[in-house]
């Protein structure tokens, strides 16, 4: 309703002057400044006869309210002469539909250029009128409906508004109709509030910006219409209840007459959910069934990666409600057989070759595909590592540390070295990425483990890492350690509390270790501390899935089992080669290397058959530097990407479709070999597909030519048949209708014999002449129809004449015509005594059968 509100604003701001000479029916006259400011737009958009016309322009029941003229500035914005009455608008609507309006179905308003939203608004009003009349059983003031079964009662709805016009085309400017529309809406809003909401009136609100206090313009606007709401002048001030125009116009959707607004309206009053609670002025639709983005964001975490986390603050976090599901989800699928000591203080030992990198993204939305393409790292041969696809967010690199004697050259770690490798952590680090994964129920024997907390504050110079997917590299500890290595420790505490969004998943503990007094403060690696604490607890990353062939039984010897602490490594931004399809892990013997191998593990989709917890965690051996134990030699574990299974299924589907396509092509060529005579004559001869198609085309061309010849021959035969039928019809038309023709001489002879017999009999009795007049038509028909060629023919034609001319339906008109002739040619009606004389004269003078 942007255009409608624009019209309302124009009606509020502009003073009223004399009417324009080009509008002979407008009751609301506009200011010339309004016309100049609006340009030719408002002058050109007029409503012609039949649309929103007014029959009696000056018949308002209430007097028009006029405000004093004066300049209106931005700070003096207020209501200017809004007519609360609806008389003219009702007349307009009733005029437009004063004929036979039988249903509230959709109307296109032909002849009036309206936008689709304007048509919707008007059709809603028509539907509401139907609802008021037939459902609420009240008379609608807008338009009346009539059913075809009402008969004469339907004339009551046909009001003679159009007759009152007497051919005058009232042209009303669009802004006048807009103002009347707003008066109509405000009127209904006040009617809804007046009878039952006197105790529930909204408290007066002071509008923002340049709005004047509602005490000044609400009274001016509504006091003459709704004294119950605003009170009379003589009413005590304490009993007066104020009303905000925002309350009245809150349900008015800004959709009507938007064609008159060229730019954005300066006044945007209605909210987004207009007409939610007003059933009297809105047509029911499917809006409540449409999904809401706000609701979707409340119940879904699909878009959580686009939300930046809050900077972590040092604090003590409460104990999570349950740690068993987290451990179960971490070591699910029963692949890497975890041996977790049940000691209360488990430690994680980081080797000298361990590297920790956290991918940090700049503030901005993150694509969820970044997680789907991220990888976990597990040991593999020194083959080219398969990196995940590059991620748009940049990496947050820290200055590389100085080279340490005894270390192999490796990529510069993003974090400085922290402590000698002899230092052990007091608590295992928490790994709680931002992406949620479903957890499975805890397996028997999984005991809750403590988690670190109370991390030191993060320096302000280090930006907070965004919760993004990051891989994990597991490096074995069974090899010689260098003199120095990055290690860190964290104070004992409680794990982070659940996030405000109400998720209950706890951050999984990635690797417990042996207990030892901490030798290094957690502040030595602030980014890691920030990384481990900033992520939301409810979003637990899916644990790596390893083939069950790599599992080691808990009771097996553990002296030669290398230890794998968890480290983080960012993926290399290089093109990703295709991965093998998912399946059992590919095992290959490894050769000794100076640098420990790394296992690379992708976070695949959770599989129900693989999500099993290996071993009883409570039955694991006691203190020991253990993260994940894998029996040497270290195998290569190759897992596909999360979409590798989908890719493999798609590849199999494509192969099947290709095989089916080729089979259909071969079947089609075999069919062609059987149909084409030139090819079927030599079945043993191998013919190429091109030759087969060529021979088939020639064969089809030959068949088409033969078919054309047959069609031409059939057409010629049809033409001959039509010519013969025409000749037969012509011969039949030349034959007589009665069979054997009778000569005209014979007709005359029979008529002379009939006249002589009538003359003789009339001289004896004059009544026979009357009988001859009645019988002459039958004699003429008998003489023309009966044939005397043979006795058989005489019999047949006589019976046919008897059936055709002597039946009562045929005799009645014949006798009637004879009597009419007797009455007109003789004086039987006027002077019956002269009939014998007239009969004798007729037979002697030869006037038989003719009028006397």
Curated annotation (Swiss-Prot):
Biased composition (Polar residues): 548-559
Broad class of where this protein is predominantly found: nucleus
Organism classification: Eukaryota, Metazoa, Chordata, Craniata, Vertebrata
Entry-annotated residues carrying Phosphoserine: 20, 23, 25, 29, 196, 556, 602, 614, 631
BP term (GO), one: negative regulation of oxidative phosphorylation
Biased composition (Pro residues): 568-584
CDD domains for this protein: bHLHzip_MLXIPL, NES2-NLS_ChREBP
Assigned keywords, A-Z: DNA-binding, Nucleus, Phosphoprotein, Repressor, Transcription, Transcription regulation, Williams-Beuren syndrome
Tissue: Expressed in liver, heart, kidney, cerebellum and intestinal tissues.
Location in or out of the cell: Nucleus
Phosphothreonine: residues carrying this PTM: 27
Keyword Phosphoprotein: yes
Self-association state and partner proteins as the record states: Binds DNA as a heterodimer with MLX/TCFL4.
A molecular function (GO) term: DNA-binding transcription activator activity
Name of the protein this chain belongs to: Carbohydrate-responsive element-binding protein
Disease involvement: WBSCR14 is located in the Williams-Beuren syndrome (WBS) critical region. WBS results from a hemizygous deletion of several genes on chromosome 7q11.23, thought to arise as a consequence of unequal crossing over between highly homologous low-copy repeat sequences flanking the deleted region. Haploinsufficiency of WBSCR14 may be the cause of certain cardiovascular and musculo-skeletal abnormalities observed in the disease.
One Gene Ontology CC term in the entry: transcription regulator complex
């Amino acid at each position: 309703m942007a255009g409608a509100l624009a019209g309302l604003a124009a009606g509020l701001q502009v003073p009223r002057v004399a009417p324009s000479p080009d509008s002979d029916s407008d009751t609301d006259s506009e200011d010339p400044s309004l016309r100049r400011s609006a340009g030719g737009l408002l002058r050109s958009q007029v409503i012609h006869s039949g649309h929103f016309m007014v029959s009696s322009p000056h018949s308002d029941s209430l007097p028009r309210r006029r405000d004093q003229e004066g300049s209106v500035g931005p700070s003096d914005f207020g209501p200017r002469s809004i007519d609360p009455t609806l008389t003219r608008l009702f007349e307009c609507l009733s005029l437009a539909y004063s004929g036979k309006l039988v249903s509230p179905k959709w109307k296109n308003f032909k002849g009036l250029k309206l936008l689709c939203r304007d048509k919707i608004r008007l059709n809603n009003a028509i539907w509401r009128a139907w609802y008021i009349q037939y459902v609420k059983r009240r008379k609608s003031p807008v338009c009346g409906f009539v059913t075809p079964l009402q008969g004469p009662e339907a004339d009551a709805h046909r009001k003679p508004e159009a007759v009152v016009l007497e051919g005058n085309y009232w042209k009303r400017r669009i802004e006048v109709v807009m103002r009347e529309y707003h008066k109509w809406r405000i009127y209904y809003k006040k009617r809804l509030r007046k009878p039952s909401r006197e105790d529930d009136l909204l408290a007066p609100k002071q509008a923002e910006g340049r709005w004047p206090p509602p005490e000044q313009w609400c009274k001016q606007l509504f006091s003459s219409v709704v004294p119950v709401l605003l009170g009379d002048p003589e009413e005590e001030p304490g009993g007066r209840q104020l009303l905000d125009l925002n309350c009245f116009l809150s349900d008015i959707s800004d959709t009507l007459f938007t064609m008159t607004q060229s730019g954005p309206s300066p006044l945007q009053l209605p909210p987004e959910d207009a007409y939610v609670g007003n059933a009297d002025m809105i047509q029911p639709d499917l809006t409540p069934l449409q999904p809401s983005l706000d609701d979707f964001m409340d119940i879904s975490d699909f878009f959580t990666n686009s939300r930046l986390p809050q900077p972590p603050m040092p604090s003590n976090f409460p104990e999570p409600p349950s740690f068993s599901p987290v451990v179960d989800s971490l070591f699910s699928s029963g692949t890497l057989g975890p041996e977790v000591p049940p000691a209360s203080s488990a430690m994680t030992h980081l080797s000298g070759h361990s590297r920790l990198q956290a991918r940090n993204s700049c503030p901005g939305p993150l694509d969820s595909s970044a997680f789907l393409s991220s990888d976990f790292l597990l040991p593999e041969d020194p083959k080219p590592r398969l990196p995940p696809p590059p991620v748009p967010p940049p990496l947050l690199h820290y200055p590389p540390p100085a080279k340490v004697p005894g270390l192999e050259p490796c990529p510069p770690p993003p974090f400085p070295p922290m402590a000698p490798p002899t230092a052990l952590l007091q608590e295992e680090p928490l790994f709680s990425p931002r992406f949620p994964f479903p957890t499975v129920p805890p397996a028997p024997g999984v005991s809750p483990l403590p988690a670190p907390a109370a991390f030191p504050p993060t320096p302000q110079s280090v930006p907070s890492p965004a919760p993004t997917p990051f891989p994990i590299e597991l490096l074995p500890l069974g090899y010689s350690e260098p003199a120095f290595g990055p290690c860190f420790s964290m104070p004992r505490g409680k794990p982070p509390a659940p996030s405000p969004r109400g998720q209950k998943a706890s951050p999984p503990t990635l690797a417990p270790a042996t207990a030892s007094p901490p030798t290094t403060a957690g502040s030595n690696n602030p980014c890691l501390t920030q990384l481990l604490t900033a992520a939301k607890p409810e979003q637990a990353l899916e644990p790596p899935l390893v083939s069950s062939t790599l599992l080691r039984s808990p009771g097996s010897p553990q002296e030669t089992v290398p230890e794998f602490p968890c480290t983080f490594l960012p993926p290399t931004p290089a093109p990703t080669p295709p991965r093998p399809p998912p399946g059992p892990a590919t095992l290959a013997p490894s050769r000794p290397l100076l640098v420990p191998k790394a296992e690379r593990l992708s976070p695949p989709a959770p599989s129900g058959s693989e999500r099993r917890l290996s071993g009883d965690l409570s039955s694991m051996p006691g203190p020991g530097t253990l993260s994940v134990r894998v029996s040497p030699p270290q195998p290569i574990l190759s897992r596909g990407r999360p979409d590798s299974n989908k890719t493999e299924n798609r590849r199999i589907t494509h192969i099947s479709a290709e095989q089916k396509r080729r089979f259909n092509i071969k079947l089609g060529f075999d069919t062609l070999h059987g149909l084409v005579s030139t090819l079927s004559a030599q079945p043993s001869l191998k013919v190429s597909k091109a030759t087969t198609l060529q021979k088939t085309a020639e064969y089809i061309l030959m068949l088409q030519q033969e078919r054309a010849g047959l069609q031409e021959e059939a057409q010629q035969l049809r033409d001959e048949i039509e010519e013969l039928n025409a000749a037969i019809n012509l011969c039949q038309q030349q034959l007589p209708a009665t069979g054997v023709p009778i000569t005209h001489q014979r007709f005359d002879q029979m008529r002379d014999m009939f006249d002589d017999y009538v003359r003789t009999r009339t001289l004896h009795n004059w009544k026979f002449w009357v009988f001859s007049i009645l019988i002459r038509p039958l004699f003429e028909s008998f003489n023309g129809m009966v044939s005397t060629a043979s006795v058989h023919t005489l019999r047949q034609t006589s019976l046919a004449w008897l059936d055709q001319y002597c039946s009562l339906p045929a005799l009645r008109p014949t006798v009637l015509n004879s009597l009419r002739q007797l009455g007109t040619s003789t004086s039987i009606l006027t002077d019956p005594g002269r009939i014998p004389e007239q009969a004798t004269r007729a037979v002697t003078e030869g006037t038989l059968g003719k009028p006397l």
